[in-house]
Amino acid sequence: MTMTLHTKASGMALLHQIQGNELETLNRPQLKIPLERPLGEVYVDGSKPAVYNYPEGAAYDFNAAAAASAPVYGQSGLAYGSGSEAAAFGANGLGGFPPLNSVSPSPLVLLHPPPQLSPFLHPHGQQVPYYLENEPSGYAVREAGPPAFYRPTSDNRRQSGRERLASTGDKGSMAMESAKETRYCAVCNDYASGYHYGVWSCEGCKAFFKRSIQGHNDYMCPATNQCTIDKNRRKSCQACRLRKCYEVGMMKGGIRKDRRGGRMLKHKRQRDEGEGRNEVGSSGDVRASNLWPSPLLIKHTKKNSPALSLTADQMVSALLEAEPPIIYSDYDPSRPFSEASMMGLLTNLADRELVHMINWAKRVPGFVDLSLHDQVHLLECAWLEILMIGLVWRSMEHPGKLLFAPNLLLDRNQGKCVEGMVEIFDMLLATSSRFRMMNLQGEEFVCLKSIILLNSGVYTFLSSTLKSLEEKDHIHRVLDKITDTLIHLMAKAGLSLQQQHRRLAQLLLILSHIRHMSNKGMEHLYNMKCKNVVPLYDLLLEMLDAHRLHAPANRGGAPMEEMNQSQLATTGSTSAHSLQAYYITEEAGAFPTTV
Protein backbone atom coordinates (compact mmCIF):
# COMPACT_ATOMS: atom_id res chain seq x y z
CA MET A 1 0.00 0.00 0.00
CA THR A 2 1.32 3.45 -0.93
CA MET A 3 0.53 6.63 1.01
CA THR A 4 1.00 10.10 -0.44
CA LEU A 5 1.90 13.14 1.60
CA HIS A 6 -0.53 15.97 0.59
CA THR A 7 0.09 18.52 3.31
CA LYS A 8 2.76 19.46 5.74
CA ALA A 9 0.62 18.43 8.68
CA SER A 10 -0.20 15.00 7.29
CA GLY A 11 3.49 14.47 6.52
CA MET A 12 4.39 15.32 10.09
CA ALA A 13 1.67 13.03 11.38
CA LEU A 14 3.01 10.18 9.29
CA LEU A 15 6.50 10.83 10.64
CA HIS A 16 5.28 10.66 14.21
CA GLN A 17 3.25 7.56 13.41
CA ILE A 18 6.38 5.84 12.15
CA GLN A 19 8.40 6.92 15.16
CA GLY A 20 5.67 5.91 17.60
CA ASN A 21 5.33 2.44 16.12
CA GLU A 22 9.06 2.02 16.21
CA LEU A 23 9.34 3.01 19.84
CA GLU A 24 6.45 0.76 20.82
CA THR A 25 8.00 -2.15 18.96
CA LEU A 26 11.40 -1.74 20.60
CA ASN A 27 9.93 -0.81 23.98
CA ARG A 28 12.39 2.05 24.27
CA PRO A 29 11.86 5.42 25.97
CA GLN A 30 10.63 8.20 23.73
CA LEU A 31 13.25 10.76 22.88
CA LYS A 32 12.87 14.38 21.97
CA ILE A 33 15.79 15.95 20.20
CA PRO A 34 15.56 19.58 19.06
CA LEU A 35 16.55 20.06 15.48
CA GLU A 36 19.04 22.90 15.49
CA ARG A 37 19.37 23.19 11.71
CA PRO A 38 17.57 21.89 8.60
CA LEU A 39 17.81 18.19 8.07
CA GLY A 40 19.25 18.74 4.62
CA GLU A 41 22.38 20.10 6.26
CA VAL A 42 22.64 17.24 8.78
CA TYR A 43 22.25 14.27 6.45
CA VAL A 44 24.13 13.57 3.30
CA ASP A 45 23.83 11.19 0.43
CA GLY A 46 20.22 10.67 -0.71
CA SER A 47 20.89 8.24 -3.53
CA LYS A 48 19.70 5.08 -1.73
CA PRO A 49 16.40 3.28 -2.53
CA ALA A 50 13.32 4.89 -1.04
CA VAL A 51 11.00 1.88 -0.79
CA TYR A 52 10.64 0.32 2.62
CA ASN A 53 8.93 -3.01 3.30
CA TYR A 54 7.22 -3.18 6.64
CA PRO A 55 6.89 -6.53 8.46
CA GLU A 56 3.21 -6.65 7.47
CA GLY A 57 4.20 -6.53 3.82
CA ALA A 58 2.75 -3.08 3.15
CA ALA A 59 4.90 -0.90 0.92
CA TYR A 60 5.06 2.87 1.02
CA ASP A 61 6.58 4.64 -1.94
CA PHE A 62 7.64 8.03 -0.74
CA ASN A 63 9.47 8.99 -3.91
CA ALA A 64 6.21 8.89 -5.90
CA ALA A 65 4.50 11.19 -3.49
CA ALA A 66 7.42 13.48 -2.82
CA ALA A 67 7.00 15.44 -6.05
CA ALA A 68 3.36 16.28 -5.26
CA SER A 69 3.98 17.40 -1.72
CA ALA A 70 5.62 20.47 -0.33
CA PRO A 71 8.68 20.12 1.86
CA VAL A 72 8.07 19.68 5.53
CA TYR A 73 10.53 22.43 6.42
CA GLY A 74 11.51 25.39 4.33
CA GLN A 75 14.82 27.17 4.46
CA SER A 76 13.24 30.52 5.29
CA GLY A 77 10.98 29.45 8.13
CA LEU A 78 8.66 26.82 9.59
CA ALA A 79 4.83 26.58 9.38
CA TYR A 80 2.64 24.43 11.59
CA GLY A 81 -0.83 23.06 11.04
CA SER A 82 -3.97 24.67 12.47
CA GLY A 83 -4.90 24.22 16.07
CA SER A 84 -7.72 21.82 15.20
CA GLU A 85 -5.41 19.61 13.25
CA ALA A 86 -2.92 19.63 16.07
CA ALA A 87 -5.63 18.81 18.59
CA ALA A 88 -6.89 15.99 16.43
CA PHE A 89 -3.36 14.71 16.20
CA GLY A 90 -2.99 14.79 19.98
CA ALA A 91 -6.34 13.07 20.45
CA ASN A 92 -5.40 10.23 18.21
CA GLY A 93 -2.69 9.34 20.70
CA LEU A 94 -0.01 8.65 18.16
CA GLY A 95 2.73 7.85 20.59
CA GLY A 96 1.11 10.00 23.28
CA PHE A 97 2.92 13.18 22.18
CA PRO A 98 1.58 16.66 23.05
CA PRO A 99 0.27 18.92 20.27
CA LEU A 100 2.90 20.64 18.21
CA ASN A 101 1.48 24.11 18.92
CA SER A 102 1.93 23.60 22.67
CA VAL A 103 5.71 23.47 22.56
CA SER A 104 8.37 26.02 21.78
CA PRO A 105 8.64 27.29 18.19
CA SER A 106 11.68 25.10 17.72
CA PRO A 107 10.42 21.90 16.11
CA LEU A 108 10.89 18.59 17.91
CA VAL A 109 11.80 15.70 15.69
CA LEU A 110 11.73 12.18 17.06
CA LEU A 111 15.18 10.99 16.14
CA HIS A 112 17.87 9.03 17.94
CA PRO A 113 21.08 10.62 19.22
CA PRO A 114 23.88 11.17 16.71
CA PRO A 115 24.33 9.79 14.17
CA GLN A 116 20.52 10.25 14.29
CA LEU A 117 19.59 6.97 12.68
CA SER A 118 16.29 5.21 13.02
CA PRO A 119 16.99 1.47 13.37
CA PHE A 120 13.80 -0.11 12.06
CA LEU A 121 13.45 -3.86 12.34
CA HIS A 122 13.52 -6.03 9.26
CA PRO A 123 11.58 -9.31 9.23
CA HIS A 124 14.82 -11.19 9.76
CA GLY A 125 15.47 -9.32 12.99
CA GLN A 126 18.32 -7.04 11.86
CA GLN A 127 18.28 -3.31 12.40
CA VAL A 128 18.60 -1.24 9.19
CA PRO A 129 19.28 2.48 9.73
CA TYR A 130 17.22 5.03 7.80
CA TYR A 131 17.55 8.78 7.74
CA LEU A 132 15.29 11.69 6.86
CA GLU A 133 16.25 14.14 4.19
CA ASN A 134 14.80 17.53 3.47
CA GLU A 135 15.17 18.09 -0.25
CA PRO A 136 13.76 20.97 -2.27
CA SER A 137 11.80 18.47 -4.31
CA GLY A 138 10.07 16.81 -1.40
CA TYR A 139 10.24 14.71 1.70
CA ALA A 140 11.83 11.28 1.55
CA VAL A 141 12.91 8.44 3.81
CA ARG A 142 16.17 6.94 2.66
CA GLU A 143 18.20 3.97 3.77
CA ALA A 144 21.51 4.93 5.33
CA GLY A 145 24.56 2.91 4.40
CA PRO A 146 26.01 1.52 7.64
CA PRO A 147 29.67 1.81 6.56
CA ALA A 148 29.31 5.56 6.08
CA PHE A 149 28.27 6.13 9.68
CA TYR A 150 29.43 3.27 11.92
CA ARG A 151 32.95 2.24 10.87
CA PRO A 152 35.49 3.14 8.21
CA THR A 153 35.78 1.02 5.13
CA SER A 154 38.68 -1.38 4.68
CA ASP A 155 40.34 1.10 2.31
CA ASN A 156 40.08 3.81 4.92
CA ARG A 157 41.49 1.49 7.54
CA ARG A 158 44.43 0.62 5.33
CA GLN A 159 45.04 4.26 4.52
CA SER A 160 44.88 5.35 8.15
CA GLY A 161 47.18 2.48 9.10
CA ARG A 162 49.68 3.55 6.47
CA GLU A 163 49.51 7.11 7.77
CA ARG A 164 50.18 5.94 11.33
CA LEU A 165 53.10 3.81 10.18
CA ALA A 166 54.48 6.69 8.15
CA SER A 167 54.23 9.06 11.11
CA THR A 168 55.85 6.49 13.39
CA GLY A 169 58.64 5.90 10.88
CA ASP A 170 59.23 9.64 10.59
CA LYS A 171 59.49 9.95 14.36
CA GLY A 172 61.84 6.95 14.54
CA SER A 173 64.05 8.30 11.79
CA MET A 174 64.14 11.70 13.48
CA ALA A 175 65.14 10.04 16.76
CA MET A 176 67.84 8.05 14.99
CA GLU A 177 69.16 11.14 13.25
CA SER A 178 69.27 13.00 16.57
CA ALA A 179 71.09 10.04 18.14
CA LYS A 180 73.64 10.07 15.35
CA GLU A 181 74.26 13.76 15.94
CA THR A 182 75.01 13.39 19.66
CA ARG A 183 78.27 11.45 19.55
CA TYR A 184 80.84 12.49 22.15
CA CYS A 185 84.61 12.45 22.11
CA ALA A 186 85.98 9.38 23.87
CA VAL A 187 88.94 11.38 25.18
CA CYS A 188 87.54 14.67 26.50
CA ASN A 189 83.76 14.10 26.26
CA ASP A 190 83.31 17.08 23.94
CA TYR A 191 81.06 16.76 20.89
CA ALA A 192 82.65 14.37 18.39
CA SER A 193 83.23 15.59 14.87
CA GLY A 194 83.67 12.12 13.41
CA TYR A 195 85.36 8.75 13.66
CA HIS A 196 89.12 9.40 13.86
CA TYR A 197 91.96 6.94 14.50
CA GLY A 198 89.63 4.17 15.65
CA VAL A 199 87.33 6.10 18.04
CA TRP A 200 84.75 8.88 17.98
CA SER A 201 86.65 12.05 18.81
CA CYS A 202 86.55 15.81 18.48
CA GLU A 203 88.69 17.86 16.13
CA GLY A 204 91.01 18.96 18.94
CA CYS A 205 91.86 15.46 20.16
CA LYS A 206 92.16 14.21 16.59
CA ALA A 207 94.68 16.90 15.74
CA PHE A 208 96.56 16.38 19.01
CA PHE A 209 96.89 12.64 18.42
CA LYS A 210 97.98 13.23 14.83
CA ARG A 211 100.74 15.59 15.97
CA SER A 212 101.82 13.17 18.68
CA ILE A 213 102.23 10.14 16.40
CA GLN A 214 103.92 12.11 13.64
CA GLY A 215 106.43 14.01 15.74
CA HIS A 216 108.17 13.68 19.07
CA ASN A 217 105.87 12.82 21.94
CA ASP A 218 108.27 12.79 24.87
CA TYR A 219 105.71 14.50 27.07
CA MET A 220 106.27 14.60 30.84
CA CYS A 221 103.46 14.83 33.37
CA PRO A 222 104.24 17.37 36.14
CA ALA A 223 102.04 15.47 38.61
CA THR A 224 101.22 11.77 39.04
CA ASN A 225 100.44 10.72 35.45
CA GLN A 226 96.75 10.67 36.38
CA CYS A 227 95.52 14.13 35.37
CA THR A 228 91.84 14.55 34.59
CA ILE A 229 91.24 15.00 30.87
CA ASP A 230 87.94 16.64 29.97
CA LYS A 231 86.65 19.42 27.77
CA ASN A 232 88.01 22.18 30.00
CA ARG A 233 91.29 20.58 31.12
CA ARG A 234 92.42 18.64 28.07
CA LYS A 235 95.21 21.13 27.31
CA SER A 236 96.64 21.12 30.83
CA CYS A 237 98.74 17.94 30.47
CA GLN A 238 99.88 16.57 27.12
CA ALA A 239 101.29 13.37 28.62
CA CYS A 240 98.02 12.37 30.28
CA ARG A 241 96.04 13.41 27.22
CA LEU A 242 98.13 11.14 25.00
CA ARG A 243 97.86 8.34 27.56
CA LYS A 244 94.08 8.64 27.54
CA CYS A 245 94.05 8.64 23.74
CA TYR A 246 95.77 5.26 23.82
CA GLU A 247 93.53 3.99 26.63
CA VAL A 248 90.31 4.69 24.73
CA GLY A 249 91.69 2.86 21.68
CA MET A 250 93.17 5.49 19.39
CA MET A 251 95.67 4.01 16.99
CA LYS A 252 97.62 5.02 13.95
CA GLY A 253 95.93 2.48 11.70
CA GLY A 254 92.43 2.94 13.10
CA ILE A 255 90.68 4.13 9.93
CA ARG A 256 87.23 2.98 8.95
CA LYS A 257 87.08 0.38 6.21
CA ASP A 258 84.37 2.29 4.33
CA ARG A 259 86.40 5.50 4.13
CA ARG A 260 86.22 6.56 0.49
CA GLY A 261 85.73 10.29 0.63
CA GLY A 262 82.84 12.42 1.76
CA ARG A 263 80.61 12.46 -1.31
CA MET A 264 80.97 8.77 -2.20
CA LEU A 265 80.42 7.74 1.41
CA LYS A 266 77.34 9.95 1.66
CA HIS A 267 75.75 8.45 -1.46
CA LYS A 268 76.56 4.92 -0.31
CA ARG A 269 75.07 5.58 3.13
CA GLN A 270 71.88 7.01 1.63
CA ARG A 271 71.56 4.01 -0.67
CA ASP A 272 72.12 1.57 2.17
CA GLU A 273 69.58 3.35 4.36
CA GLY A 274 67.00 3.19 1.57
CA GLU A 275 67.59 -0.53 1.11
CA GLY A 276 67.45 -1.04 4.85
CA ARG A 277 64.04 0.62 5.08
CA ASN A 278 62.72 -1.67 2.38
CA GLU A 279 63.98 -4.74 4.19
CA VAL A 280 62.72 -3.86 7.66
CA GLY A 281 59.34 -5.45 7.14
CA SER A 282 60.74 -8.72 5.83
CA SER A 283 63.59 -9.15 8.28
CA GLY A 284 61.58 -8.59 11.42
CA ASP A 285 64.73 -8.41 13.51
CA VAL A 286 66.66 -5.16 13.37
CA ARG A 287 69.68 -5.46 15.59
CA ALA A 288 71.34 -2.52 17.28
CA SER A 289 74.66 -3.46 15.73
CA ASN A 290 73.25 -2.63 12.29
CA LEU A 291 72.39 0.94 13.27
CA TRP A 292 76.01 2.07 13.43
CA PRO A 293 78.99 0.84 11.44
CA SER A 294 81.41 -1.33 13.37
CA PRO A 295 84.49 0.74 14.25
CA LEU A 296 86.92 -2.06 13.45
CA LEU A 297 86.50 -5.58 12.26
CA ILE A 298 88.83 -7.52 14.56
CA LYS A 299 90.26 -10.58 12.92
CA HIS A 300 90.61 -13.53 15.22
CA THR A 301 94.17 -14.31 14.22
CA LYS A 302 94.56 -16.60 17.24
CA LYS A 303 91.54 -18.77 16.54
CA ASN A 304 93.71 -21.86 16.48
CA SER A 305 95.31 -21.15 19.86
CA PRO A 306 95.66 -24.42 21.78
CA ALA A 307 94.24 -22.76 24.89
CA LEU A 308 90.87 -22.21 23.24
CA SER A 309 90.53 -25.86 22.26
CA LEU A 310 91.10 -27.22 25.78
CA THR A 311 88.26 -28.84 27.66
CA ALA A 312 87.45 -27.76 31.21
CA ASP A 313 89.29 -30.73 32.73
CA GLN A 314 92.31 -30.14 30.51
CA MET A 315 92.37 -26.47 31.52
CA VAL A 316 92.34 -27.40 35.20
CA SER A 317 95.13 -29.93 34.70
CA ALA A 318 97.27 -27.38 32.84
CA LEU A 319 96.80 -24.77 35.57
CA LEU A 320 97.62 -27.21 38.36
CA GLU A 321 100.78 -28.34 36.59
CA ALA A 322 101.85 -24.72 36.12
CA GLU A 323 101.86 -23.98 39.87
CA PRO A 324 105.24 -22.67 41.11
CA PRO A 325 107.32 -24.61 43.65
CA ILE A 326 107.30 -23.92 47.38
CA ILE A 327 109.84 -21.31 48.47
CA TYR A 328 111.44 -21.07 51.92
CA SER A 329 112.48 -17.83 53.56
CA ASP A 330 115.77 -16.91 55.26
CA TYR A 331 114.07 -16.46 58.62
CA ASP A 332 116.23 -17.05 61.70
CA PRO A 333 114.05 -17.76 64.77
CA SER A 334 116.85 -16.73 67.09
CA ARG A 335 116.77 -13.12 65.88
CA PRO A 336 113.97 -10.83 67.05
CA PHE A 337 111.92 -8.98 64.48
CA SER A 338 112.53 -5.33 63.67
CA GLU A 339 111.10 -3.14 60.94
CA ALA A 340 114.20 -3.53 58.80
CA SER A 341 114.60 -7.27 59.36
CA MET A 342 110.97 -8.10 58.64
CA MET A 343 110.87 -5.95 55.52
CA GLY A 344 114.13 -7.54 54.40
CA LEU A 345 112.66 -11.04 54.80
CA LEU A 346 109.46 -10.17 52.94
CA THR A 347 111.11 -8.33 50.05
CA ASN A 348 113.69 -11.08 49.58
CA LEU A 349 110.92 -13.66 49.52
CA ALA A 350 108.86 -11.60 47.06
CA ASP A 351 111.83 -11.12 44.74
CA ARG A 352 112.43 -14.87 44.51
CA GLU A 353 108.73 -15.54 44.01
CA LEU A 354 108.70 -13.11 41.10
CA VAL A 355 111.27 -15.23 39.28
CA HIS A 356 109.03 -18.29 39.51
CA MET A 357 105.96 -16.21 38.72
CA ILE A 358 107.36 -15.48 35.27
CA ASN A 359 107.75 -19.18 34.59
CA TRP A 360 104.25 -19.86 35.94
CA ALA A 361 102.70 -17.17 33.73
CA LYS A 362 104.27 -18.69 30.63
CA ARG A 363 102.56 -21.97 31.42
CA VAL A 364 99.11 -20.41 31.80
CA PRO A 365 97.15 -21.49 28.68
CA GLY A 366 96.94 -18.68 26.16
CA PHE A 367 99.48 -16.37 27.82
CA VAL A 368 102.40 -17.15 25.51
CA ASP A 369 100.16 -16.46 22.49
CA LEU A 370 100.43 -12.77 23.37
CA SER A 371 103.26 -10.55 22.23
CA LEU A 372 106.26 -10.11 24.52
CA HIS A 373 105.26 -6.51 25.19
CA ASP A 374 101.79 -7.52 26.37
CA GLN A 375 103.07 -10.40 28.49
CA VAL A 376 105.36 -7.99 30.31
CA HIS A 377 102.54 -5.48 30.67
CA LEU A 378 100.20 -8.00 32.30
CA LEU A 379 102.86 -9.16 34.75
CA GLU A 380 103.74 -5.58 35.69
CA CYS A 381 100.09 -4.89 36.51
CA ALA A 382 99.29 -8.09 38.42
CA TRP A 383 102.42 -9.26 40.23
CA LEU A 384 101.45 -8.13 43.75
CA GLU A 385 97.87 -9.37 43.41
CA ILE A 386 99.22 -12.80 42.42
CA LEU A 387 101.57 -12.85 45.40
CA MET A 388 98.75 -11.84 47.75
CA ILE A 389 96.20 -14.40 46.57
CA GLY A 390 98.88 -17.09 46.93
CA LEU A 391 99.57 -15.89 50.49
CA VAL A 392 95.86 -15.92 51.35
CA TRP A 393 95.46 -19.42 49.90
CA ARG A 394 98.37 -20.80 51.91
CA SER A 395 96.99 -19.20 55.10
CA MET A 396 93.54 -20.79 54.90
CA GLU A 397 94.47 -23.56 57.34
CA HIS A 398 96.00 -21.12 59.84
CA PRO A 399 93.25 -18.88 61.25
CA GLY A 400 94.57 -15.53 62.49
CA LYS A 401 98.00 -16.03 60.87
CA LEU A 402 99.66 -15.52 57.50
CA LEU A 403 101.87 -18.25 56.03
CA PHE A 404 104.44 -16.36 53.95
CA ALA A 405 106.59 -19.50 53.71
CA PRO A 406 106.57 -22.91 55.37
CA ASN A 407 109.07 -21.56 57.91
CA LEU A 408 107.61 -18.02 58.19
CA LEU A 409 104.21 -17.86 59.90
CA LEU A 410 103.30 -14.39 61.20
CA ASP A 411 100.35 -13.11 63.22
CA ARG A 412 98.88 -9.65 63.54
CA ASN A 413 100.95 -8.64 66.56
CA GLN A 414 104.20 -9.47 64.82
CA GLY A 415 103.16 -7.27 61.91
CA LYS A 416 102.99 -4.24 64.22
CA CYS A 417 106.75 -3.88 64.14
CA VAL A 418 106.45 -2.43 60.62
CA GLU A 419 104.71 0.92 60.33
CA GLY A 420 101.46 0.67 58.36
CA MET A 421 101.64 -3.12 58.05
CA VAL A 422 98.75 -3.90 60.45
CA GLU A 423 96.09 -2.56 58.11
CA ILE A 424 97.34 -4.76 55.28
CA PHE A 425 97.60 -7.74 57.64
CA ASP A 426 93.95 -7.29 58.66
CA MET A 427 92.76 -7.24 55.05
CA LEU A 428 94.79 -10.35 54.22
CA LEU A 429 93.43 -12.19 57.25
CA ALA A 430 89.85 -11.21 56.36
CA THR A 431 90.27 -12.53 52.82
CA SER A 432 91.77 -15.77 54.12
CA SER A 433 88.81 -16.16 56.47
CA ARG A 434 86.45 -15.63 53.55
CA PHE A 435 88.20 -18.33 51.52
CA ARG A 436 87.98 -20.67 54.47
CA MET A 437 84.27 -19.96 54.94
CA MET A 438 83.60 -20.64 51.25
CA ASN A 439 85.72 -23.81 51.40
CA LEU A 440 87.70 -22.72 48.35
CA GLN A 441 89.12 -25.64 46.38
CA GLY A 442 92.57 -25.81 44.81
CA GLU A 443 91.13 -26.02 41.30
CA GLU A 444 89.11 -22.85 41.91
CA PHE A 445 92.17 -21.10 43.32
CA VAL A 446 94.32 -21.69 40.23
CA CYS A 447 91.49 -20.43 38.01
CA LEU A 448 91.15 -17.25 40.07
CA LYS A 449 94.88 -16.63 39.96
CA SER A 450 94.90 -16.97 36.17
CA ILE A 451 91.96 -14.57 35.89
CA ILE A 452 93.91 -12.00 37.92
CA LEU A 453 96.87 -12.31 35.56
CA LEU A 454 94.90 -11.98 32.34
CA ASN A 455 92.43 -9.35 33.53
CA SER A 456 94.89 -7.03 35.29
CA GLY A 457 95.95 -4.83 32.38
CA VAL A 458 93.58 -5.73 29.59
CA TYR A 459 92.05 -2.24 29.62
CA THR A 460 95.31 -0.30 29.87
CA PHE A 461 97.22 -1.50 26.81
CA LEU A 462 99.41 1.27 25.48
CA SER A 463 99.97 -0.28 22.06
CA SER A 464 98.76 1.90 19.21
CA THR A 465 98.35 -0.77 16.56
CA LEU A 466 95.57 -3.02 15.42
CA LYS A 467 97.48 -5.92 16.95
CA SER A 468 96.70 -4.65 20.45
CA LEU A 469 92.98 -5.03 19.75
CA GLU A 470 93.57 -8.56 18.55
CA GLU A 471 95.47 -9.24 21.78
CA LYS A 472 92.59 -7.91 23.86
CA ASP A 473 90.14 -10.06 21.98
CA HIS A 474 92.30 -13.13 22.55
CA ILE A 475 92.58 -12.36 26.28
CA HIS A 476 88.81 -12.01 26.58
CA ARG A 477 88.26 -15.37 24.93
CA VAL A 478 90.77 -17.07 27.24
CA LEU A 479 89.08 -15.41 30.23
CA ASP A 480 85.74 -16.77 29.04
CA LYS A 481 87.31 -20.22 28.81
CA ILE A 482 88.59 -20.04 32.40
CA THR A 483 85.23 -18.75 33.64
CA ASP A 484 83.51 -21.68 31.95
CA THR A 485 86.00 -23.94 33.70
CA LEU A 486 85.01 -22.47 37.07
CA ILE A 487 81.34 -23.13 36.33
CA HIS A 488 82.19 -26.67 35.25
CA LEU A 489 83.96 -27.29 38.55
CA MET A 490 80.93 -26.08 40.51
CA ALA A 491 78.55 -28.21 38.48
CA LYS A 492 80.86 -31.17 38.97
CA ALA A 493 80.66 -30.59 42.74
CA GLY A 494 76.88 -31.01 42.60
CA LEU A 495 75.79 -27.38 42.98
CA SER A 496 72.49 -26.30 41.48
CA LEU A 497 72.39 -23.68 38.75
CA GLN A 498 71.42 -20.95 41.21
CA GLN A 499 74.20 -21.98 43.60
CA GLN A 500 76.71 -21.95 40.74
CA HIS A 501 75.78 -18.39 39.81
CA ARG A 502 75.94 -17.24 43.41
CA ARG A 503 79.31 -18.86 44.11
CA LEU A 504 80.81 -17.53 40.89
CA ALA A 505 79.70 -14.01 41.79
CA GLN A 506 81.14 -14.35 45.30
CA LEU A 507 84.51 -15.53 43.99
CA LEU A 508 84.78 -12.75 41.43
CA LEU A 509 83.82 -10.14 44.02
CA ILE A 510 86.77 -11.25 46.14
CA LEU A 511 89.09 -10.33 43.26
CA SER A 512 88.17 -6.66 43.61
CA HIS A 513 89.10 -6.85 47.30
CA ILE A 514 92.45 -8.38 46.36
CA ARG A 515 93.01 -5.51 43.91
CA HIS A 516 92.36 -3.05 46.74
CA MET A 517 94.84 -4.87 48.99
CA SER A 518 97.40 -4.79 46.20
CA ASN A 519 97.10 -1.03 45.83
CA LYS A 520 97.52 -0.58 49.58
CA GLY A 521 100.54 -2.88 49.59
CA MET A 522 102.08 -1.02 46.66
CA GLU A 523 101.76 2.32 48.45
CA HIS A 524 103.28 0.86 51.60
CA LEU A 525 106.17 -0.71 49.72
CA TYR A 526 106.87 2.52 47.89
CA ASN A 527 106.90 4.45 51.18
CA MET A 528 109.38 1.96 52.59
CA LYS A 529 111.54 2.47 49.53
CA CYS A 530 111.41 6.27 49.86
CA LYS A 531 112.38 6.07 53.56
CA ASN A 532 115.29 3.76 52.70
CA VAL A 533 114.12 1.28 55.30
CA VAL A 534 115.27 -1.60 53.18
CA PRO A 535 117.00 -1.81 49.78
CA LEU A 536 114.86 -3.38 47.09
CA TYR A 537 116.15 -6.03 44.75
CA ASP A 538 116.46 -5.28 41.05
CA LEU A 539 113.47 -7.23 39.76
CA LEU A 540 111.20 -6.17 42.62
CA LEU A 541 112.22 -2.54 42.18
CA GLU A 542 111.52 -2.64 38.45
CA MET A 543 108.13 -4.25 38.99
CA LEU A 544 107.22 -1.70 41.65
CA ASP A 545 108.05 1.28 39.45
CA ALA A 546 106.35 -0.22 36.40
CA HIS A 547 103.20 -0.98 38.37
CA ARG A 548 102.98 2.59 39.59
CA LEU A 549 103.12 3.84 36.02
CA HIS A 550 100.20 1.63 34.97
CA ALA A 551 98.15 1.83 38.18
CA PRO A 552 95.08 4.10 38.54
CA ALA A 553 95.26 7.41 40.39
CA ASN A 554 96.89 7.10 43.78
CA ARG A 555 94.73 8.31 46.62
CA GLY A 556 96.31 10.22 49.43
CA GLY A 557 99.89 9.69 48.32
CA ALA A 558 102.73 11.08 50.39
CA PRO A 559 104.17 14.48 49.47
CA MET A 560 107.52 12.78 48.91
CA GLU A 561 105.93 10.89 46.05
CA GLU A 562 105.47 14.04 44.01
CA MET A 563 109.09 14.99 44.58
CA ASN A 564 110.27 11.77 42.97
CA GLN A 565 107.98 11.71 39.93
CA SER A 566 110.70 12.48 37.42
CA GLN A 567 112.91 9.78 38.89
CA LEU A 568 110.00 7.33 38.85
CA ALA A 569 109.23 8.08 35.21
CA THR A 570 112.86 7.66 34.23
CA THR A 571 113.15 4.35 36.07
CA GLY A 572 109.80 3.11 34.85
CA SER A 573 110.64 3.76 31.23
CA THR A 574 113.22 1.00 31.33
CA SER A 575 111.24 -1.45 33.43
CA ALA A 576 109.80 -3.30 30.48
CA HIS A 577 113.24 -3.79 29.00
CA SER A 578 114.55 -5.12 32.32
CA LEU A 579 111.71 -7.60 32.66
CA GLN A 580 112.20 -8.66 29.06
CA ALA A 581 115.82 -9.32 29.95
CA TYR A 582 114.59 -11.69 32.66
CA TYR A 583 112.45 -13.36 30.03
CA ILE A 584 115.42 -13.85 27.74
CA THR A 585 117.62 -15.08 30.58
CA GLU A 586 114.96 -17.56 31.66
CA GLU A 587 114.57 -18.80 28.11
CA ALA A 588 118.29 -19.52 28.05
CA GLY A 589 117.97 -21.54 31.25
CA ALA A 590 120.02 -19.13 33.36
CA PHE A 591 117.28 -18.38 35.84
CA PRO A 592 118.23 -19.25 39.40
CA THR A 593 116.05 -21.98 40.83
CA THR A 594 116.51 -21.22 44.49
CA VAL A 595 113.80 -22.86 46.52
From Swiss-Prot:
Q: Where is this region: Mediates interaction with DNTTIP2?
A: 185-310
Does the record's keyword annotation contain Coiled coil? no
Q: Which residues form the NR LBD domain?
A: 311-547
Q: Where is this region: Required for interaction with NCOA1?
A: 35-47
Record key words, sorted? Activator, Cell membrane, Cytoplasm, DNA-binding, Glycoprotein, Golgi apparatus, Lipid-binding, Lipoprotein, Membrane, Metal-binding, Methylation, Nucleus, Palmitate, Phosphoprotein, Receptor, Steroid-binding, Transcription, Transcription regulation, Ubl conjugation, Zinc, Zinc-finger
**Residues where Phosphotyrosine occurs?**
Y537
DNA-binding span(s): 185-250
- Primary location group: nucleus
Zinc finger, NR C4-type: residue spans?
Answer: 185-205, 221-245
* GO biological process, alphabetically ordered: cellular response to estradiol stimulus; cellular response to estrogen stimulus; estrogen receptor signaling pathway; negative regulation of canonical NF-kappaB signal transduction; negative regulation of DNA-binding transcription factor activity; negative regulation of smooth muscle cell apoptotic process; nuclear receptor-mediated steroid hormone signaling pathway; phospholipase C-activating G protein-coupled receptor signaling pathway
Concerning its family, UniProt says: Belongs to the nuclear hormone receptor family. NR3 subfamily.
Q: What role does this protein play?
A: Nuclear hormone receptor. The steroid hormones and their receptors are involved in the regulation of eukaryotic gene expression and affect cellular proliferation and differentiation in target tissues. Ligand-dependent nuclear transactivation involves either direct homodimer binding to a palindromic estrogen response element (ERE) sequence or association with other DNA-binding transcription factors, such as AP-1/c-Jun, c-Fos, ATF-2, Sp1 and Sp3, to mediate ERE-independent signaling.
Q: What is this protein called?
A: Estrogen receptor
Q: Which gene encodes it?
A: ESR1
